[in-house]
């Protein structure tokens, strides 16, 4: 069965066709711009739909093959949808701040994750031998780790594909992915460059409703990949098979 798709109607309803003011555009996005209206660039959704479908198929196939997806979106309106989508699909995310070397210096990051997990175990266990001040310090350290590493604590290595909201804001994350040869799927507004993006998706990257639509679509594609892998392995999925057969292609 094909991966979930996002329709033209859904994109228009979410305001995905609205780019930025024309004077803020990046000329490299010209091939994806339909025109301008009242000083605002209008993105060409007739390209967005097939490009989105292509990206979702790739994500689904990657997960089916045992790959991991890293959702990245640290701007305010993307933080919650990014985390929810990653959790719902059993994937991983960064939604607070991208730490330099998060992928290219994975060995150091892995050490920090070990410390994070050790803190969680310590605080969940018997803290009777610690002073209130010591418990507070450990709690603050754990909370700091939760913000920066909570979404990748169980990733276990670099991801196989990265999904990005706002390529400008997440420039460092994209550069690290490029260095490591990790394919990047990114929502590209009219003010960004498509350079370094393996799967460009021209669409508004600011509207909350649109961001949620993209995140849910990627989560659905990743979930489908996981289910297909389980079915292919001959796992007994019980009642899962019936809903799968009836699942609509549309998100």
Curated annotation (Swiss-Prot):
Keywords: Ribonucleoprotein, Ribosomal protein. GO terms for cellular component: cytosolic small ribosomal subunit. One of its GO terms (molecular function) is structural constituent of ribosome. Transmembrane segments: none annotated. PROSITE patterns: RIBOSOMAL_S2_1 (PS00962), RIBOSOMAL_S2_2 (PS00963). GO terms for biological process: translation. It holds the Pfam family Ribosomal_S2. InterPro entries: Ribosomal_uS2 (IPR001865), Ribosomal_uS2_bac/mit/plastid (IPR005706), Ribosomal_uS2_CS (IPR018130), Ribosomal_uS2_flav_dom_sf (IPR023591). Belongs to the universal ribosomal protein uS2 family. PANTHER family: 30S RIBOSOMAL PROTEIN S2 PROKARYOTIC AND ORGANELLAR (PTHR12534), SMALL RIBOSOMAL SUBUNIT PROTEIN US2M (PTHR12534:SF0). This is Small ribosomal subunit protein uS2. It comes from Novosphingobium aromaticivorans (strain ATCC 700278 / DSM 12444 / CCUG 56034 / CIP 105152 / NBRC 16084 / F199). The gene is rpsB.
